[in-house]
């Protein structure tokens, strides 16, 4: 297993993308600190990791609150001795365009996506340096952070900012042997998230593809070169690779698990 003996702290552990990543890290041998503002999501994520034979704790935390983040990072150290892997995935969906979004909504959404990553990255990095750990950090982006998407101004802007944050932090922390990368998912098949929510015993409606934003096709997967949408387990495997020694010379890099979405020439319709 790639991550045997490693401790991973994962934020935003809903049953979909981040739940899949948390379970993927556990399957490669990591023990988990599962964090979400929804205590049921955090706890059921931890229980799913324990069911796989690993250790896990859950922490309910607002990632924008420095006091709560400080306490969460301290508890990870108390419980496991420290953190080896940080995955910043906490998010907030609010699908509005520039003409509809209020400044309060803008601040809250960008605060969750950017400030949350800033706080966890800063505090976990300080802990890693204090403990002499050559750790790994992964920020979860989105194809919306690479491309313009109508009706999603706060999310896309924050994800784009997080992409550059990754590169900048990678340079700041390289001298300490801490690698920092990002992982870009795209529109994701809902089946696995729904199955995981049922298995966890929690409610997760998730964004319905084709209904979330104006102009989406009925079958978004048909527009990808791979002709299908990825699932959270695909992201989990990619995150495990980035966090492993197999990626020891990779930092400041964005790994796109998007079925070729970003690389595709815009006018080509693979499904036609």
Language-model features and meaning:
Residues 3-32:
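Canonical Rossmann dinucleotide-binding motif of NAD(H)/NADP(H)-dependent dehydrogenases/reductases
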Residues 30-45:
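Conserved glycine-rich Rossmann-like NAD(P)H-binding loop of the short-chain dehydrogenase/reductase
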Residues 97-98, 105-110, 220:
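Substrate-binding pocket helix/loop in short-chain dehydrogenase/reductase
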Residues 121, 158, 166:
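Active-site helix of classical SDR
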Residues 126, 130, 171-175, 248:
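Alpha-helical segment proximal to the catalytic Tyr-Lys
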Residues 142:
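Residue(s) in the substrate-gating loop at a strand-loop-helix junction
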Residues 147, 240, 251-272:
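Short C-terminal tail/terminal secondary-structure segment
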């Amino acid at each position: 297993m790639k991550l045997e003996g490693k401790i991973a702290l994962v934020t935003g552990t809903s049953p979909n993308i981040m739940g899949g990543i948390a379970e993927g890290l556990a399957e490669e041998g990591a023990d988990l600190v599962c964090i979400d503002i929804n205590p049921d999501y955090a706890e059921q994520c931890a229980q799913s990791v324990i069911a796989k034979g690993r250790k896990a704790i859950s922490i309910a935390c607002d990632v924008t609150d420095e006091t709560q983040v400080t306490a969460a990072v301290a508890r990870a150290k108390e419980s496991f001795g420290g953190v080896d892997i940080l995955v910043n995935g906490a998010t907030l969906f609010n699908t509005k365009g520039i003409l509809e979004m209020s400044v309060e909504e803008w601040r809250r959404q960008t605060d969750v996506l950017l400030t949350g990553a800033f706080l966890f990255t800063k505090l976990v990095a300080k802990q890693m340096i204090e403990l002499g750990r050559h750790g790994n950090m992964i920020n979860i982006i989105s194809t919306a952070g690479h491309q313009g998407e109508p009706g999603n101004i706060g999310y896309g802007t924050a994800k784009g900012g997080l992409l550059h944050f990754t590169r900048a932090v990678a340079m700041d922390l390289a001298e300490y042997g801490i690698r920092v990368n990002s992982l870009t998912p795209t529109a994701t098949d809902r089946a696995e998230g729904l199955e995981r929510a049922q298995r966890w015993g929690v409610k997760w409606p998730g964004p319905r593809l084709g209904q979330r934003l104006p102009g989406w096709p009925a079958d978004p997967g048909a527009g990808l070169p791979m002709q299908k949408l990825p699932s959270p387990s695909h992201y989990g495997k990619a995150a495990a690779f980035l966090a492993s020694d197999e990626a020891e010379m990779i930092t400041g890099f964005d790994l796109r698990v998007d079925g070729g979405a970003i690389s595709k020439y815009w006018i080509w319709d693979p499904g036609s």
